[in-house]
Amino acid sequence: MVFYMYNMMMNLNLLKEMRTNNKLVLNKLVLKNLLYWINKDTFKENMKIYSNYNNNYMNTNLQNKNIKRINNKLYRYMPIQSEWSNKLITKLYITNIKNMNKLLFKNIINNNNNDNFNIINLFNNKYNNNNIMMNLLMFKYLTGWSTQLKGRYTNNMSRTNTTVNKSGTFNNKKYTFIKNNYKLNYISANHNISNLYNVNKNGKYNLKIKLNYI
């Protein structure tokens, strides 16, 4: 009886240990998967697909079904992108621009012996107020994507169908720097812009999906 109880206790301890090890292994796998996507390098690549379509298929199936299918798949990730953009990307972006402004004026003051007249002249000559946001831009952020169908016929006539989808990274917010209002990616969130033309001839078309950045 004692030996039986001892075996039961050993088996229970072994099962607990196996469960603990399984949890640890599972947690490591989950963490590894998360770190892969968090630390994954961002890149952009154009995808090109060449196919022949007749007039009816081009005007109905390809435009109305395939492009919508692509957009629907991409829009699934919009809530995640918006959440991260609003809380993390925007905060980091604004903080870096403020730090750059502090360094900018500090260097101007130090290099001109606190001469206000020289400070103003140096600033006006070196920096253009219209382009200052481009000079302060340090990172590239995804603003959306565009789907383009472009083809050329035997008589040298071309047809291009383009669908542009934009998602505002900074959620349509304005920020003030150096007594001027600058728009940071001032794009309406989840706004669709379509430029579609009816294709009335048969031909070969190139389908290209491009990611748009600022």
From Swiss-Prot:
Location, primary (coarse class): mitochondrion
Protein name: Small ribosomal subunit protein uS3m
Function description: Essential for mitochondrial protein synthesis and required for the maturation of small ribosomal subunits.
Transmembrane segments: none
Keyword Heme: no
Protein keywords: Mitochondrion, Ribonucleoprotein, Ribosomal protein
Biological-process GO terms, alphabetical: translation
Cellular component terms (Gene Ontology): mitochondrion; ribonucleoprotein complex; ribosome
Listed Pfam families: VAR1
InterPro entries: Ribosomal_uS3m_fun
UniProt superkingdom: Eukaryota
GO molecular function: structural constituent of ribosome
UniProt family annotation: Belongs to the universal ribosomal protein uS3 family.
Signal peptide: none
Locations listed in the record: Mitochondrion
